[in-house]
Structure formats: C-alpha cells, structure tokens
C-alpha cells in the first residue's frame, strides 16, 4: 500500500496545492479572484471544509463563502454563527455566536469576534482586518470582589454596512458603528460611531469624514476586493 506521506512528497502538484491552500487561508481575498484552472479544486476543497464545520457546529454558511480550515468557528443552539453570501474567514480567526455577518463580509487573520449573550451583527461589505477584536460582553469591576467572581454583562454590538475595522482595533460591548465608517488601526471604540466617520485613538474619537476625502478613493473594482487590510 502506498504511503500517503511519500506520495505527497513525490507529487509536485499535491505540494503546490497544499501551499496554495495555505496562501488562500491567510489571504482569502485571493480565493475570489482564482483563475478557472484553480477554481474547481479550490471549490471542492472548500466544500469539504465547510461540510465538516456544519457537521460539528451550529453554523449557516451562505453560497460562495471561504472559510480557512485553521479558523476557529463555534456556534451552539441559540448562539449560532451565520455568514451571508461570499463572506471570508481567514486563518486563526476566532468566531463565536451569536454572530451574524451580512453578504461579502471579510474577517481577516487572527481577528476575534465573540457575541456574548446579546450578539454581534455586521452589515454587508464590511472589512474586519487582522487582529481586530469585537467582544459583545464585559466583566463587572466593582472594587470589593475579584473580577473573576463578578457577573458578565452583554449588550451586543452592531456594525453597519461598508465599514472598515482596521488592524488590531477593538470594539467594546454596547457599541454601534454606523454605515461607511472607518475605525483606524489600533483604535479602541467605546462609544457609538456615526455613519461615514473616521475614528482613531484610545479611546477612539472622530478625526474625519470619509466624504471629505475624495482623493483617497477611486472607481469600484470588479468583483471581490483584492486588498487584505
């Protein structure tokens, strides 16, 4: 009987596909721009990954999604995870329900989203960059008891459509981020963010408005965005 490890070592096509899968897992926006000669095997691979996830967790995955096998996605009855069409979840991202992502939402590498009890909702087309943290719960911090013994509270988080959450940014429980807003890299959002606002800093504050920066945009690209931040 042929040893699978030996066959893998001797077959350059298998080695190429394994490396290509790793590349897609860490940069999933590339999946949506695959050339036809790669799309068939990549879609078959994703069908296997997603079927295994559905069999073990309370998740709903819309058509055309990409889920890295290295991602950690956990849903329970009443605390499920729902991904709309053409969403992507990169390697080492952590998702825990209740969580609902609209169509074409991207969650990049090492981002963490936990819905607590009240849940997280993310609107269509929003980008959540690498290392971002969105936690819909917090601990009591009364001085007369250890933090570990105090109650956990959850009010929920709502993030609108076409929002960009920058790398290593944090969104705290109870916050609403309006449509088209931008949260800068490393910002910590503790209050609601208006639509179109650009916020930065710790704690985050409004530093601009997307509509006032026409020079930093451009015509929409064709298909799925190819940037990864």
Please describe what each predicted stretch is.
Residues 44, 166, 184:
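Short, conserved clusters of charged catalytic residues that mark active-site
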Residues 172, 182-184, 188:
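A generic "structured core" feature
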């Amino acid at each position: 009987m042929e040893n699978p490890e030996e066959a893998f070592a001797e077959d350059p096509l298998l080695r190429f596909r394994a490396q290509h899968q790793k590349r897609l897992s860490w940069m999933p926006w590339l999946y949506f721009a695959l050339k036809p000669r790669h799309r068939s095997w990549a879609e078959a691979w994703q069908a296997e990954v997603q079927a295994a996830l559905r069999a073990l967790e309370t998740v709903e995955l819309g058509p055309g999604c990409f889920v890295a096998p290295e991602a950690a996605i956990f849903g329970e009855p009443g605390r499920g995870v729902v991904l709309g069409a053409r969403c992507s979840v990169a390697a080492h991202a952590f998702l825990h329900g209740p969580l609902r992502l609209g169509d074409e939402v991207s969650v990049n590498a090492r981002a963490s989203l936990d819905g607590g009890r009240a849940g997280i909702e993310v609107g269509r087309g929003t980008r959540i960059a690498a290392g971002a943290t969105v936690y819909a719960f917090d601990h009591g911090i009364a001085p007369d008891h250890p933090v570990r013994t105090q109650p956990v509270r959850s009010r929920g988080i709502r993030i609108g459509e076409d929002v960009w959450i920058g790398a290593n940014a944090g969104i705290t429980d109870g916050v609403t981020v309006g449509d088209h807003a931008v949260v800068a890299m490393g910002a910590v959002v503790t209050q609601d963010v208006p639509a179109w606002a650009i916020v930065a800093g710790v704690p985050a504050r409004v530093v601009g408005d997307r509509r006032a920066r026409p020079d930093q945009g451009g015509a929409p690209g064709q298909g799925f965005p190819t940037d990864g931040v």
